[in-house]
């Protein structure tokens, strides 16, 4: 239970993965008559899950990354990330992109996404089109997710994306405030959040963005929007409510 885990250093989502795997194994054993024990169905045998605080890259930060002079290997990683940041596609779909998905005449990208098996049609951003043309009218080669995440952190540091970000993490059942350099929080999935957040901030309607990201509800979509408390406060300060004369 949660009390016993509080003595350790595991984070809730790590514990959740352990429990989820264990429940799957026990369910298989039960359904295939290896055991009659069905305790895994009990309510207290739950999967732990915590909403993890994540970041996104602003368009200014993406531009800094885009302008870096890099070797061929690093360029492929950077360019794949930029494509994801302006299409909202998951890493798994970026890895599947082929020339047949690209329509340069109408500047559209069309693909059936792997996770949700949904057809999405995405306008081709000028940066995305430039990247495809750079690689001979096709997508850049994609590395393994683990390698990509490692390289991205280094490239974001090189691009000067090093401002400090404070978040709250749970470890050993205790919440702590932890500070990271932003570059160290970047993963391939940051690109998808960056697309959703930047499009939302640009005033594109949520439902239009959801047609691209594949979110079925606005509630699940809003979890992708990563506007910091400082950005929110600055936006609010421009509202007439905060502009009243004393």
Report the location of each language-model feature.
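N-terminal core-binding DNA-recognition domain of tyrosine recombinases/integrases
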Residues: 1-53, 67-68
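Catalytic-site neighborhood detector that most strongly recognizes the C-terminal catalytic loop/helix
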Residues: 56, 113-117, 213-238
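Conserved tyrosine-mediated DNA breakage-rejoining catalytic core shared by Y-recombinases
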Residues: 87, 96-132
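Short, polar N-cap/turn motifs at the start of nucleic acid-interacting alpha helices
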Residues: 101-108, 185, 201-224
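C-terminal secondary-structure termini that scaffold catalytic or DNA-interacting sites
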Residues: 161-163, 238-246
